[in-house]
């Protein structure tokens, strides 16, 4: 409690805004001014008059915040909080890939570095990936970096030829339908909601496939359902419980967070 009070005092003194991604641990989410997905948080911060942004997330998220708020100071509480998916592609590997497919348009998922985004034709989020790909004039698409998301998009937009970069989010890719099935045996009436970064077998088993922000809306479409199995980072369950306290949420996997209250305090 003393640490939380100190964080709040420093936030006020330094005119800071604290952002916490939906995947952060609940104590970090609870001290944040805004919680949400990476792009949504960066947009929220850009609309504030804060001088300092403390982004409780990973490196590419802080980069996005800086791009949208170039005149604000942006701090990442844990400098080692990286994203294996974003690290899986570099400008050099993107250029090599592009040379092999010169007639394709590069669509880059927001979970990537600023340098890679800058070399892409268009960027997308997991929430709008389908609509972005569908909107393109071309039928030939290079989708980077997440091949699981690319596969899901390709199913929704079969009229496009989508070539996927060979990278995954380890947190989502580790999930298997077998583990979802085991959880479902304990909760046979549960609604399964999966993130599109999950493997194909998990996505195919889900009732709903959507971004983290989309999950908050998806639960509302099942007013009679009591239990939901959530196939994404466990931190997302905290926001779901806050929005729907009368529902039960069961995680299909574990914890990958590195930001803690101490590191958030140190940033400020």
Regions found by a protein language model. Give the residues of each.
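Single conserved hydrophobic/aromatic residue that forms the stacking wall/gate
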Residues: 261-268
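Active-site loop-to-helix "anion-binding N-cap" substructures in soluble metabolic enzymes
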Residues: 1-230, 236-260
């Amino acid at each position: 409690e003393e640490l939380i009070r100190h964080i709040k005092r420093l936030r006020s003194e330094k005119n800071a805004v604290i952002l916490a991604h939906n995947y952060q641990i609940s104590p970090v989410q609870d001290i944040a001014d805004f919680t949400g997905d990476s792009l949504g948080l960066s947009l929220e911060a850009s609309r504030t008059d804060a001088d300092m942004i403390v982004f409780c997330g990973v490196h590419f998220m802080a980069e996005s915040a800086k791009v949208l708020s170039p005149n604000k100071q942006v701090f990442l509480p844990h400098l080692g909080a990286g994203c294996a998916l974003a690290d899986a592609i570099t400008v050099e590997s993107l250029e090599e890939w592009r040379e092999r497919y010169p007639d394709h348009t590069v669509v880059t998922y927001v979970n990537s570095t600023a340098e890679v985004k800058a070399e892409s034709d268009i960027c997308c989020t997991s929430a709008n990936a389908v609509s972005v790909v569908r909107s393109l004039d071309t039928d030939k698409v290079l989708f980077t970096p997440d091949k699981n998301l690319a596969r899901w998009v390709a199913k929704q937009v079969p009229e496009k030829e989508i070539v996927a970069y060979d990278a995954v989010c380890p947190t989502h890719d580790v999930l298997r339908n077998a583990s979802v099935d085991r959880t479902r045996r304990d909760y046979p009436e549960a609604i399964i909601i999966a993130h599109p970064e999950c493997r194909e077998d998990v996505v195919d088993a889900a009732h709903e496939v959507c971004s983290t922000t989309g999950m908050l809306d998806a639960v509302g479409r099942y007013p009679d359902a009591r239990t939901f199995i959530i196939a994404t980072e466990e931190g997302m369950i905290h926001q779901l419980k806050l929005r729907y306290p009368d529902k039960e949420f069961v995680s299909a996997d574990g914890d990958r967070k590195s930001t803690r209250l101490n590191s958030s305090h140190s940033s400020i």
